[in-house]
Regions:
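Contiguous interface-forming segments/domains that mediate binding rather than catalysis
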Residues: 1-111
């Protein structure tokens, strides 16, 4: 898959997860850390002025696989592997935006 297809796959897996479908949300955000032998994901659901931890169902956490593919593809192009990805999905749409952190492996991690 190319990078655009991987972005679409990641977003589709997240918004199609039954646990995500069961909650009201205007926006979702996920901080994903991928290092050799280690994967971690933290997520939040936003509805109006309210927020709560996002459910990490099988499809949401399964999005780590295409995210790993995306990391590999980007590293093959640039020679540099990112440490974290910040996934932000908003409604209406939904629209997906993914930002990447190459230096600080804890930049977006909960404090």
């Amino acid at each position: 898959m190319d990078k655009d297809e991987l972005f679409l796959t990641i977003g589709t897996m997240i918004v199609s997860d039954p646990e995500i479908l069961a909650v009201e949300w205007d926006a979702l955000s996920f901080v994903c850390s991928i290092d050799p032998g280690h994967r971690q994901m933290t997520g939040y659901c936003y509805a109006g002025d309210e927020w709560e931890g996002a459910p990490l169902g099988d499809m949401v956490f399964g999005a780590m696989n295409p995210l790993q593919e995306l990391q590999d593809a980007m590293a093959a192009e640039t020679g540099n592997r990112w440490k974290q990805a910040l996934i932000h999905i908003t409604r209406p749409g939904p629209e997906i935006d993914i930002q990447f952190e190459y230096d600080d492996p804890r930049r977006w991690s909960p404090k």
